[in-house]
Each structure stands twice: as structure tokens, then as C-alpha cells.
Amino acid sequence: KWILQAELFNELYRWVRADWKKIKQATNSYREAEKYYGVVRDFLKAAKLAWGDTWANDGYMATKPVTLKAMIRVCADLARVDADPADGRVQRWEARLSPWSEQQRAFKSEGFYERFPAKGEVERVARIHRDLARAAGIEVKSTAKNG
């Protein structure tokens, strides 16, 4: 199962809410929206390359909602420090996310919830976010609302 549109929207909204002061200063909101779209698009391309054969593989959790939500949070953290220039971004980010290929075993579907214990999905997404960011050397921006 891939992520539901509402789940994806909630993660993007969380990012926008966290960066709102910067976003509202943009004079061309359409261009700003295109910029964020490009960031997410390029991040997902880089993530696909970094995950390799685990991407869209039913035997792994790399493209399940819990991990995709965590990856969008990593995307927001990475974009804060390395969104520009857009040229070469996929290659830069693929290199940055390449340690994720070493995480493939942890993201096998079998035993996944035991390897990432949590009280619920909100806590599990936060944990996976921290683990993926740490593996890629990306600083996690803490937010007041952690959900």
C-alpha cells in the first residue's frame, strides 16, 4: 500500500507550517510552490536511487506510509540546508542518502515493527525520521508539535 493523499498532505502541511515565516515572504507564491514541488520530486528520486531494490518492493517497508512520512520529514530537514542549487540536486542528495542502502535489512517487512518499537504510528514515524536523518548525516529540526 502506498501512502494516502491525505497522509502525504499532512506531512507537507507540517513542513509548510514549520517554514511559514520564510514562505510568506515570497513575492510569487506560485513560483514558491513550484520550488517546493521540485524539492520533493528530486528528494523522492534520490531516495529511490539510495534505497535501490528495496524501493517499491513488497518485502520491504521503504515505500510504506510510515517510512514515506518519515522521509518527507527528512526531505524538509535536508531542503533547509541544501535545496539550492536545483541543478545537480538529485545527484547530491543521492550521495547524501546513500547510507540508506545499508539500512535495507532493518526495513524488511518481516519483523519491522519489532525493530522500530513505538506506542503508535506517530511515535514510529518520528523514530524512523530521526534514524534516517542520522544515517544520512542530516540535522533534524525539532518542531513544537511533533505529530
Q: Positions of the model-derived regions?
A:
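Accessory terminal alpha-helical modules
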Residues: 1-147
